[in-house]
């Protein structure tokens, strides 16, 4: 152990005392970004009798005492040989170039340290802010690096953010002169193709740079310029007298900017042009239609049935842009538009269909089955008749939308039609944590004052765990008969531990109830925990759960380890996952004491199953659960 070399990663004081996190020399490069100039070499202080030192992950360690050995420079000749033992030459070259330490690159070259295989394909693009000096260094030493000259050319042409335009031209001129001095046949076609794929590189100066070296297909450049909307390049190509077919250019996914350029040049836009532009294969029809309208290119005389059919079938939302500016009512099937508008909840389009005579009763079966309750309520308010057919009732809609109080009119209809009962709906939606007003309404429809909702405990637990207490007071004041389990949970949440103990003591079935245990552990109350341990002292399965649930709180965890015979080494994965889910500081404790084993418990493990049963997804982050 002592023969290894360790470096300080970070210090945590979350436990009230420092915990030092270290990594070994194998992980130096991967665990330090390229801006870090030096790291601190340390070793555990073996003189301390209460020293703890664990490897919680391969090559990563936690300890409570360290001795600083030395500050180790990462940009120094003295450390290169050691770094090369554990990382690729590519990573070292990258680090040295980013810090402009060309002297260290010289050292690597002197030692004949080649780039790792295939690194030539991406080293230039992986170096952040590669400056002129570093780039020229690579060019002048390319007999050693063996990067393809085409790769270097493409990088220089593209790299307009870090290197000025004048410098780019200077480097390209230098490259061409350099290459002409030795026997290398460069593939300029590859470079031209690269220039064409990016609007930042498709520039006149770049085209002219290679025009004398290779036959350029100006028609390909024209089509690409039309796609990018580069009017400067379009004008440049047209001035060369290139003949073109306007319709063929339009088929090349022409941008609105380029289209406007050609209109200004005298090209006439007819319905053929529009139908070529707007076709089932068109990319982003929504944006295209908006642009055609905003640029005054699309006019009433260009609106045809064929165009409207294409839009309806490919992007119904785009019809919304047309109804405000054009008269299309006699060219469309209102029922077809209504169905699509309902399917995607496009309210403006729905209103337009209704205002233009669409029969509000015709689609009620579809609406009841497929649409959100807000739409259903809207149609009912307009006088639509809900069919007396229970098959048009879709209970899943309520489960989806019960978190919003605008579904109450929909619920009233369901209950009045006797498609379902308020009591049954409550039982079906309770785990989805419905809006408090939805619960209040449903309870007002129930005459059974002895109603119990077993799964309501999960709502209490979820709100308690994730600080979502805004509905809690309303929940416990509702007209509900709480069962014993729920009463105990309420007492624990409200801090009435004496009442909770009395209820548990008089109800034997609740002694080893895991929901009650879970809430107790979340309360961090040692006295309540001691009570539960006393009455379950011989229940090994229960004590195992106590250990797992305690792992989010160091005080509780230490208490359980010291006062039970459960071996924490047998439950490392469960404790690691549980504490990590709640973003608990106890993760540091687990790592320091060799109880940490990552967060990779299996789906459908017993912890996963229990947490799902109380409405918590252990695999989702704590913050995401809070937003539910």
Curated annotation (Swiss-Prot):
The keyword Repeat applies. InterPro entries: Ankyrin_rpt, Ankyrin_rpt-contain_sf. ANK repeats lie at residues 217-246, 333-362, 421-451, 512-542. Keywords: ANK repeat, Repeat. The keyword Repeat applies. This is Putative ankyrin repeat protein L769. It comes from Acanthamoeba polyphaga mimivirus. The lineage of its organism: Viruses, Varidnaviria, Bamfordvirae, Nucleocytoviricota, Megaviricetes.
């Amino acid at each position: 152990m002592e023969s290894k070399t360790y470096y300080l990663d970070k210090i945590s004081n979350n436990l009230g005392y420092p915990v030092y996190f270290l990594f070994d020399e194998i992980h130096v490069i991967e665990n330090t970004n390229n801006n870090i100039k030096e790291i601190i070499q340390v070793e555990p202080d073996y003189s301390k009798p209460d020293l703890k030192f664990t490897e919680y992950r391969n090559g990563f360690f936690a300890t409570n005492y360290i001795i600083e050995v030395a500050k180790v420079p990462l940009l120094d000749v003295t450390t290169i040989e050691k770094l090369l033992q554990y990382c690729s030459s590519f990573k070292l070259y990258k680090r040295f170039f980013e810090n402009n330490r060309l002297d260290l690159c010289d050292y690597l070259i002197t030692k004949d340290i080649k780039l790792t295989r295939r690194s030539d394909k991406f080293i230039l693009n992986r170096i952040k802010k590669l400056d002129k000096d570093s780039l020229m260094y690579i060019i002048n030493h390319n007999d050693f690096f063996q990067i393809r000259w085409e790769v270097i050319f493409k990088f220089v042409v593209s790299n307009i953010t870090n290197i000025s335009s004048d410098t780019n031209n200077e480097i390209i001129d230098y490259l061409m002169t350099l290459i002409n001095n030795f026997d290398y046949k460069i593939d300029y076609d590859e470079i031209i193709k690269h220039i064409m794929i990016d609007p930042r590189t498709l520039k006149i100066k770049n085209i002219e740079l290679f025009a004398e070296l290779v036959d350029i297909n100006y028609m390909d450049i024209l089509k690409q310029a039309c796609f990018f909307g580069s009017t400067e390049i379009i004008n440049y190509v047209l001035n060369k007298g290139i003949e073109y077919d306007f319709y063929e250019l339009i088929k090349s996914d022409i941008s609105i900017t380029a289209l406007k350029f050609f209109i200004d040049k005298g090209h006439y836009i007819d319905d053929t042009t529009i139908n070529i532009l707007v076709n089932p294969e068109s990319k982003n029809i929504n944006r295209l239609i908006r642009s055609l309208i905003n640029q005054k290119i699309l006019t009433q005389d260009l609106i045809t049935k064929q165009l409207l059919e294409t839009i309806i079938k490919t992007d119904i939302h785009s019809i919304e842009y047309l109804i405000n500016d054009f008269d299309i009512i006699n060219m469309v099937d209102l029922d077809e538009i209504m169905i699509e508008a309902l399917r995607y909840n496009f309210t403006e389009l729905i209103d337009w269909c209704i205002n233009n005579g669409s029969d509000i009763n015709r689609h009620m079966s579809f609406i009841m089955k497929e649409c959100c309750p807000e739409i259903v309520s809207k149609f009912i308010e307009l006088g639509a008749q809900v069919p007396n057919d229970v098959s048009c009732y879709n209970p899943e809609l309520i489960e989806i939308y019960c978190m919003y109080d605008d579904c109450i009119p929909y619920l009233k209809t369901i209950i009045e039609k006797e498609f379902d009962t308020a009591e049954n709906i409550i039982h079906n939606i309770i785990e989805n944590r419905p809006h408090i007003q939805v619960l209040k309404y449903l309870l007002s429809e129930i005459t059974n004052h002895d109603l119990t909702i077993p799964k309501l405990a999960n709502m209490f637990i979820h709100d308690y765990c994730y600080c979502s207490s805004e509905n809690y007071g309303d929940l416990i004041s509702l007209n509900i008969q709480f069962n014993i389990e729920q009463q105990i949970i309420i007492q624990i949440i409200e801090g009435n531990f004496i009442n909770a103990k009395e209820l548990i003591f008089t109800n034997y079935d609740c002694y080893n109830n895991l929901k009650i245990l879970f809430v107790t552990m979340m309360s961090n109350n040692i006295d309540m925990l001691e009570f539960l341990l006393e009455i379950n002292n011989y229940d090994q399965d229960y004590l195992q759960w106590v250990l797992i649930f305690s792992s989010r709180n160091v005080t509780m965890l230490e208490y359980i380890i010291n006062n039970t015979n459960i071996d924490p080494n047998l439950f490392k994965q469960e404790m690691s996952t549980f504490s990590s889910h709640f973003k608990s500081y106890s993760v540091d404790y687990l790592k320091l004491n060799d109880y940490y084993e990552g967060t990779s418990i299996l789906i459908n493990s017993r912890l996963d199953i229990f947490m799902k049963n109380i409405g918590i997804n252990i695999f989702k982050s704590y913050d995401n659960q809070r937003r539910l």
